[in-house]
Regions:
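Short hydrophobic alpha-helical runs that function as membrane-insertion/retention elements
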Residues: 10-11, 44-46, 132, 159
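Structural signature of the thiamine diphosphate
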Residues: 13, 33-85
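Flexible, glycine-rich active-site loops centered on histidine and acidic residues
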Residues: 16-18, 25
Length: 181
């Protein structure tokens, strides 16, 4: 229906990515972003925390005229960060969860963002290395102007994918960087 009849569909994937413990490795999809990311008109999003889920669902139901794949972590997972009070989900954009000046790291979802956030704290404390951690919930959309603003003068850019290396968000970020120079 999504491709042939041009009908809006909201897909929800659970147990996607590398999940700690829980249901085991045979139930974890690590190829969904690459498999679904190239489907025309299909937007892929993974919320960073419970607070972002409502905005993602509202986007899928009320704002996106095309189909959406919402990638959820369906096991309890506590996060060491909070979204800013004024945070609004905007297509292709995210939000800095932690400021930094030595490097910037883009990630998504509660598992990878939590690990990135905790790693940034260790780097700051033990090595005086300042890592900016950015939540980018859009898995196959990156706003080039926003990306450029987030990077600014920082020369080290990293991504963490909760996915196979090929076809994940990191490739979309790299492609956008090559487009904007």
């Amino acid at each position: 229906n999504n491709a042939t009849e041009k009908k809006k569909i909201i897909y929800v994937g659970s147990l996607a990515g590398f999940l700690p413990g829980g249901p085991g490795h045979s139930h974890q999809s690590v190829r969904d972003i690459s498999a679904l990311g190239g489907i025309p008109g299909l937007t892929l999003i993974e919320p960073s925390c419970e607070a972002e889920v409502a905005q993602v669902v509202d986007y899928a139901v009320n704002q996106n005229e095309f189909s959406t794949y919402i990638r959820l972590v369906s096991i309890p997972y506590s996060v060491p960060f909070e979204l800013p009070d004024n945070y609004e989900l905007k297509e292709g954009q995210g939000v800095a969860l932690r400021e930094g000046t030595d490097a910037v790291l883009f990630a998504y979802g509660p598992v990878m963002l939590s690990e990135a956030y905790l790693a940034a704290e260790i780097l700051e404390k033990d090595y005086k290395f300042s890592l900016k951690v950015v939540n980018l919930p859009w898995l196959n959309l990156v706003d080039g102007h926003w990306l450029s603003d987030q990077i600014g003068e920082i020369r080290r850019v990293f991504t963490i994918d909760n996915h196979l290396l090929n076809g994940g968000q990191g490739q979309y970020i790299a492609a956008t960087l090559s487009e904007i120079g």
